[in-house]
Amino acid sequence: GAKHVILRYPDLYRRHQVAWGPYTNYITQDIRRIMNYRNWSKIVTNNPDGEYGHQHHKKTDELVTAVSHENAEHYDKLYYFEKFYTQDAIPEGLAKLPSDVAQKKHALIFKNYFDRGAIRMYEYFNDYENWVKATDWQ
């Protein structure tokens, strides 16, 4: 079975962000189908801030969170990506991921994400970005 699922909805078209408004119902149906496909141990998505404010990350969080609220078991398994910090604002003492987890994360990022510019721009935070249970998000 699948260890993870990454939806590939369009982000950019000819260097302009694609508006997801017309596709929201389709995206929601896909999220619902995936959540109900199997008994996932965790459901992990973008945080409500969209990490660094990306409109599609915010929308993804909104939709995944809304669908997870339809089933208490799903919501109990919902996690968000850690609060995002700029390179000069990482709090002192913010825990880094264990090295084996960080290595797996780096491999997953390079395998699944095509925006190499964004990968390079935010790479400094990869070793810190853990998951936060949705009920603990502040």
Roles of regions detected by a PLM:
Residues 1-74:
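Active-site beta-strand->loop->alpha-helix modules in alpha/beta enzyme cores, enriched
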Residues 73-138:
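The feature marks non-catalytic terminal segments
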